């Protein structure tokens, strides 16, 4: 499995996460269609927030990153949020507990 973490902070980040929260159903529908998606999580932090996307393979990660970029460009382009800090890697342990 592969993971990408996209961290938004600085200019426009708080406003971006306000908008993401307001449109979370649309965001979930957009990201839910990613092929091979294992999990997608949006987290608000003090200065903005971050997303964590876990997919079965690199293809899913690439699709998820592209969908996120397109959603932000279409729905939040006027906010002027800085580009996210992106960290990617291979999952070494994964646990789901309900």
Segments from the language model and where they lie:
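Short S/T/G/P-rich N-terminal loop/turn motif that feeds into the first structured element of a domain
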Residues: 1-50, 56-70, 77-98
């Amino acid at each position: 499995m592969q993971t990408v973490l996209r961290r938004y902070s600085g200019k426009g980040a708080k406003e971006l996460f306000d908008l993401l929260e307001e449109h979370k159903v649309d965001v979930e529908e957009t990201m839910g269609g990613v092929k091979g998606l294992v999990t997608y999580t949006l987290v608000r932090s003090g200065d903005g927030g971050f997303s964590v996307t876990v997919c079965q393979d690199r293809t899913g990660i690439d699709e998820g990153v592209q969908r996120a970029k397109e959603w932000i460009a279409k729905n939040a382009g006027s906010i002027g949020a800085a580009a996210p800090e992106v960290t990617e890697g291979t999952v070494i342990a994964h646990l789901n507990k309900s």
